[in-house]
Amino acid sequence: MLRETGVMNIECPATMRRHVQKVLGGEYEVPYRATRPVILDIGTNVGSFAAWALKRWPAAHVHCYEPLPNNFALLKKNPGSLEGQSISLNNFAIGDPSLKNLYLGRNNCGEASFYDVGEQLPATVEVETRAPSVLPKAHIMKMDTEGSEIDILSRMPSIDFDVVMLEYHSEANRRKIDELLADFFLVGGEIRSLHRGTLKYFHGRLVKAAGLLVPRRVG
């Protein structure tokens, strides 16, 4: 196990070190200025995003959702030590409630998934999955669910966050995500490789309020 320095120490397996450092370094940075945002961290893993978010928005409250038992144990040691103050911990998945068997990651504990997207082992762990209707209202939603993004977005009664940040794990899912987030504008992200990347969206009302609905003339 290694410990990374951010808003607090993050304990993680050595195979997660690079990923934790990237998140703590601002992978999910967006120019969102709310002072007390409620944040959903779906696919919390060991807690690096939650730790970064509490440094970025110190008065925020982060609701964490992590189904994998070993990850959840580390989460409780990391930002989960603030449970009841700035953090709420939930040891279940969000998505299709019929899905119970989570494939373990082939390379690290961040690759656990209900789907084989090329980075999973045959071994599975049985977990609990709840529908997105259990989620509280929030300003920001971050998702890193290794292929369950469409399961989650398509089951939401409404998608009314100010900010949505998520990873995608196939080109087909990326295009579907764009359809489901029709009221949002893509404001940032990173394409790491074919079928893999991070996307950041602002709701159209924020873009309209900033006077940016009409593209600026270049040249």
Q: Residue ranges of each PLM-predicted region?
A:
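Phosphate/nucleotide-binding beta-alpha loop and adjacent structural elements of enzyme active sites
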Residues: 1-219
